[in-house]
Design a protein with these regions (language model features):
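Chalcogenol-based redox active-site neighborhoods
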Residues: 2-156
């Protein structure tokens, strides 16, 4: 399920990923924007990636091998919709067995930690990809244009 809904195949001059593949068109704050590459589709294997946790430690998707993993990807905790999604995932994650919910954004780990602490969120794992371009390259989610250019499109 995508938070920013793809409306059609990318047209015009959308972004391109490192392999030169065209991105997808999404609606961001009522304006068309393009992702840096094609988004993963249901059934595709999620590529491994590196991110930073609240302790400034590098983590990878493979660190959670053997567990079910839900990726909640969003532009920033400083947007109401993204903050709400993290709160809702936290509430639902409490009842999930052998499952981790990774809330991934380009927010700095300090901001993510402060948000989760202030909100009392302890059932999700906030991860920052602020220095990890492999994530945005492999997942095709970086916004190549539009009002939030440079951040990531929302995706689950």
């Amino acid at each position: 399920m995508m938070g920013l809904m793809p409306v059609r195949a990318a047209a015009g001059v959308p972004g391109r990923n490192l392999q030169g593949e065209k991105g997808e068109t999404v609606i961001c704050r009522g304006v068309e924007a393009h992702t840096s590459g094609p988004m993963l589709q249901v059934g595709q294997v999620a590529p491994d990636f590196h991110a930073v946790n609240a302790k400034m430690e590098e983590v990878s998707l493979s660190d959670f091998k053997g567990k079910k993993v839900i990726l909640n990807i969003f532009p920033s905790l400083d947007t109401p919709t993204c903050a709400l999604s993290v709160r809702q995932f936290n509430a639902r994650a409490a009842g999930l067995e052998n499952t981790v919910v990774l809330c991934i954004s380009m927010d700095l780990p300090f901001a993510q930690s402060r948000f989760c602490s202030t909100e009392g969120l302890d059932n999700v794992i906030p991860l920052s990809v602020f220095r990890s371009r492999d994530f945005v390259a492999h997942y095709g989610l970086q916004l190549a244009d539009g009002p939030l250019e440079g951040l990531m499109a929302r995706a689950v």
